[in-house]
């Protein structure tokens, strides 16, 4: 059974159609990338799937729960990390994870916190205040927060955006490890080079339309290209 099923999804802001009848499926444990330039409709799609935006037409199902009629059920099994997510700067990393954990599971709070600490992998800095963290450290803390709840589906908007090479590499390793344990990952990225390493399948989106989708290697072969950037350019033309 697919974890995510999106069929003919349309999302409008007033008269502007941001997402235009897109469809895709994601299997359990897959890392699926929604890839495209800024303004292509990636974040809107992720916000719809995370139940933050209502759809105008089409359907979305998460593990057979319908987005329109069962959003509360969906919220219990997903985790969403927006690109511009922040953390409480006056708290330590540990205190921040503790604060979040209490919203999810009062009985197993300690276990959940330890899981978040392990994922973030900040060492002794976990007990320092968040406002002393670098951007990469903050992002690792936030990824730990998103994944410590053991969601069935983790939705990550531009998880490595703005990070240096080392921190981006660390985030990619975290995502790979979590997916290997059975969590399904839906992420967005405008970095078309990293998705060849990270994603099992991708969908290329431009101006609200999915213009191509499949396994990165299959797309490279189909379009006789060296990388996904070349594929995207050829498809758009």
Regions found by a protein language model. Give the residues of each.
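Conserved ABC transporter NBD signature motif
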Residues: 58-66, 73-74
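Conserved ABC ATPase "signature" region
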Residues: 98, 102-125
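Catalytic Walker B motif of ABC-type/P-loop ATPase nucleotide-binding domains
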Residues: 154-158
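Helical segment within the ABC ATPase nucleotide-binding domain
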Residues: 169-181
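ABC ATPase "signature
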Residues: 213-214
């Amino acid at each position: 059974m697919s974890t995510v099923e999106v069929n003919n999804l349309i999302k409008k802001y007033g008269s502007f159609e941001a997402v235009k009848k897109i469809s895709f499926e994601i299997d359990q444990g897959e890392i699926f990338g929604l890839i495209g330039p800024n303004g292509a409709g990636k974040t809107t799609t992720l916000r719809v799937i995370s139940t933050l935006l209502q759809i105008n037409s089409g359907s979305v199902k998460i593990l057979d729960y319908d987005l329109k009629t069962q959003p509360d059920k969906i919220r219990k099994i997903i985790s969403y990390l927006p690109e511009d997510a922040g953390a409480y700067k006056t708290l330590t990393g540990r205190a921040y994870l503790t604060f979040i954990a209490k919203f999810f599971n009062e009985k197993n709070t300690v276990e959940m916190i330890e899981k978040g600490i392990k994922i973030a992998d900040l060492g002794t800095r976990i007990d320092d205040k968040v406002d002393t963290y670098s951007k990469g450290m903050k992002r690792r803390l936030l990824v730990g927060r998103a994944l410590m709840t053991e969601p069935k589906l983790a939705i990550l908007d531009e998880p490595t955006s703005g990070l240096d090479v080392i921190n981006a590499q660390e985030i990619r390793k975290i995502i790979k490890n979590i997916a290997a344990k059975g969590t399904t990952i839906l992420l967005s990225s405008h970095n078309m080079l990293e998705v060849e390493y990270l994603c099992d399948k991708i969908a290329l989106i431009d101006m609200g339309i999915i213009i191509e989708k499949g396994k990165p290697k299959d797309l490279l072969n189909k379009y006789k290209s060296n990388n996904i950037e070349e594929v995207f350019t050829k498809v758009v033309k």
